[in-house]
C-alpha cells in the first residue's frame, strides 16, 4: 500500500493504475476536448477541455443477466474512474437483435446500481447504447470501402472459414477481394437496403490474409440480420460486429482507457488499426483510446459463460436466472 496523493490514491498497485498514472503524469489526454456528448472529431473539437481526467467504460451485452465475473469488471472500471477523477460510461453493446431484450437492459442497470456505482456525473448521464452510433458506424464503413480498405464478401461461412487458414497456414484471398471500391460500395448499399438475405454477404476489412494474427485476416465488419432491434426496430437489417463496434464507440465517447478481459488481447491490433485508419480520415480526435486487458474472474466448479448459463436456463437444467446455483447478480 502506498501513501495517497492526487495521482496516487491509497490503493493496492496494479498495472492498470501504473498505466493511468503514467498517462496523467505525461499529460497524454490533458488537451483533449469533449463536446458534452459522444461525437466525431469536429464535435469534440468545438467543446471545452474535458473535465474528466480519464474515461473508462463497462460494456455489457443485454442478452442475459450479469454474473459475479462481470462484477470484477464493473468494480474495476468504475473504481478506476472514481479514484482518478474520471468518468465511467455504461454502454450497452446492443448489436445482436436476435438475443437482446429490454428486460436485460433494466436488470443490468439495477445490478450496477446495486454494486454502488453510477454513471451520472455533474448532472449528466453517461448511459449509452452502441445502437446510438449505428449511423456513424455505417458512415465509417462506407469510408473504408471508398478507400479500398473494406469489401463485400459473398462466400459462404464454410468457404470463408476454409480460406482463413490457421496458426500454421496463411489464409488465401477471397475471390471478392479484388473488386473496385465502387463495386463494393454498391453491394454494401444493397445489403443495407435489405436486398440480401441473412448470411448472404458480409462486409470485411481488407488487411492481410497472411497475417500471423488471425484477427487481422480480413475480419468481418458487418453482417445481415433481418430481425427487430429492441431500440431501433426494423430500421436496420445490417449490424456491426463486436470488433468494429467497440473501438468506434470508445472513440466517439472519448474513452481514454478501454479495459477488457484477456480474451480480447489478440483483438487489440485490429482495434488499433481501425482507430488509426479512421483518425487519418479525420473521424476521431487524437489521441485515440487505448485498449488494456486484465484476467477475468473464474470460480472453480462454477459456470461463468453467459452463453452456457443461458443454455442451462433454456434447457431447464436450472429453474431460472435467479436459481441459487447460478452465479448471477439477480
Q: How would you label these PLM feature ranges?
A:
Residues 1-11:
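Basic/polar N-terminal segments that are highly enriched at the extreme N-terminus
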Residues 296-322, 326-330:
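Substrate/cofactor-recognition hotspot
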Residues 26, 79-87, 111-122, 251, ...:
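Secondary-structure transition/capping motifs at alpha-helix termini
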Residues 11-21, 28-106, 228-261:
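N-terminal catalytic cores of NTP/NDP-binding nucleotidyl/phosphoryl-transfer enzymes
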Residues 90, 96, 102, 129, ...:
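Active-site cores that bind ATP or allylic diphosphates and position pyrophosphate for catalysis
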Residues 18, 106, 110, 269-273:
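Residues on a specific face of well-ordered alpha-helices
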Residues 86-89, 116-121, 246-256, 287-290, ...:
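Short acidic (Asp/Glu) and glycine-rich catalytic loops that position anionic groups and cofactors
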Residues 104-131, 140-143, 148-151:
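A glycine-rich helix N-cap at a beta->alpha junction
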Amino acid at each position: 500500500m502506498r501513501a495517497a496523493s492526487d495521482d496516487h490514491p491509497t490503493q493496492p498497485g496494479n498495472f492498470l493504475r501504473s498505466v493511468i498514472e503514467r498517462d496523467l503524469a505525461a499529460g497524454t489526454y490533458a488537451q483533449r476536448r469533449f463536446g458534452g456528448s459522444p461525437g466525431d472529431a469536429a464535435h469534440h473539437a468545438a467543446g471545452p477541455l474535458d473535465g474528466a481526467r480519464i474515461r473508462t467504460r463497462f460494456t455489457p451485452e443485454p442478452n442475459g443477466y450479469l454474473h459475479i465475473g462481470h462484477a470484477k469488471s464493473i468494480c474495476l472500471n468504475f473504481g478506476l474512474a472514481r479514484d482518478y477523477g474520471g468518468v465511467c460510461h455504461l454502454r450497452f453493446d446492443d448489436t445482436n437483435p436476435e438475443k437482446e431484450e429490454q428486460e436485460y437492459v433494466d436488470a443490468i442497470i439495477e445490478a450496477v446500481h446495486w454494486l454502488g456505482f453510477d454513471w451520472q456525473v455533474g448532472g449528466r448521464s453517461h448511459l449509452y447504447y452502441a445502437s446510438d452510433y449505428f449511423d456513424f458506424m455505417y458512415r465509417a464503413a462506407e469510408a473504408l470501402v471508398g478507400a479500398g480498405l473494406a469489401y463485400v464478401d459473398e462466400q459462404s461461412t464454410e468457404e470463408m472459414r476454409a480460406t482463413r487458414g490457421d496458426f500454421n497456414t496463411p489464409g488465401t484471398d477471397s475471390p471478392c477481394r479484388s473488386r473496385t471500391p465502387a463495386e463494393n460500395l454498391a453491394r454494401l448499399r444493397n445489403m443495407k437496403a435489405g436486398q440480401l438475405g441473412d448470411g448472404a454477404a458480409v462486409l470485411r476489412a481488407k488487411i492481410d490474409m497472411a497475417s500471423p494474427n488471425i484477427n487481422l485476416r480480413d475480419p468481418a465488419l458487418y453482417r445481415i440480420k433481418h430481425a427487430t432491434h429492441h431500440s431501433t426496430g426494423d430500421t436496420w437489417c445490417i449490424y456491426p460486429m463486436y470488433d468494429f463496434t467497440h473501438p468506434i464507440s470508445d472513440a466517439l465517447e472519448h474513452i481514454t482507457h478501454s479495459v477488457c478481459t484477456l480474451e480480447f488481447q489478440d483483438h487489440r491490433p485490429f482495434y488499433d488499426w481501425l482507430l488509426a485508419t479512421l483518425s487519418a480520415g479525420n473521424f476521431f480526435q487524437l489521441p485515440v483510446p487505448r485498449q488494456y486487458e486484465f484476467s477475468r474472474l473464474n470460480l472453480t466448479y462454477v459456470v461463468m459463460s453467459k452463453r452456457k448459463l443461458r443454455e442451462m436456463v433454456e434447457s431447464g437444467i436450472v429453474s431460472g436466472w435467479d436459481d441459487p446455483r447460478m452465479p448471477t447478480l439477480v
